[in-house]
Amino acid sequence: MAEEAEKHPDKPIEVWATDEHRLGLKPIHRRVWAPIGERPLALGHHRYEWLYVTAFVAPSRGETVWYLSNGLDKPFFAKLLEVFARETGAGRDRIIVLQLDNAGWHTPENLPVPDGIRLVYQPARTPELQPAEHLWPLVDQPLANKYFDTIDDLETVVAQRCCDLNFDRNLIAQHTGFHWWPKSVAPT
C-alpha cells in the first residue's frame, strides 16, 4: 500500500480481494429444525453442471462486484480484470491493490493486468487469509436444501442473491472486514 501511495499520491488506494466459487446442480445440504419425530426432506439429484461466481470485495467498505460464468480460465480471468477495472474506475479514479489466491488462472505469466490494478498473491494453502472466501456461505444461503431442475434456475437464484448482497454492505463488511485488513489510503 505504501509503495502504491508513493507512486500515486493524487489517487485513493484501496485494497480489494477476489475469489471464485463453483456451484452446481449437486445439492447443498444443511441442518434444519424440524418437529420431534419428523424428518425434514431435502430433494437431491446429483448432476454435474457448474456455475462459477467470481466476487471482488472491498472488505473495509463492504463493496462488492459479482460476475457469473459457466467456466474459468486465464483468458476469461484477464477479461474479468479488465471489466472490473473499468467498472470500478481503477487507474482513472483510484488504484486498487487486489489480493488473490494462487489458482492456475491467476498466475502472473501471460496475465495482462489493467492500469490501476496491482495484484498481490496470498501464501499458498491459506484460504483463511482471503476475505472473499467468507462470502460463499452468504451466497449459498438461498440454495441450501433446494432442488434446481436446470443450471438456469440455479443462476437466477444466485444472481438475485448477489444483487441482494450488493445492497447489504454492513453484512459484507461484518463477514470480510478482518481487524488486520488494511484500510484505504486517501490522496495527499
Regions found by a protein language model. Give the residues of each.
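Short functional hotspots at interaction and active-site rims
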Residues: M1-T188
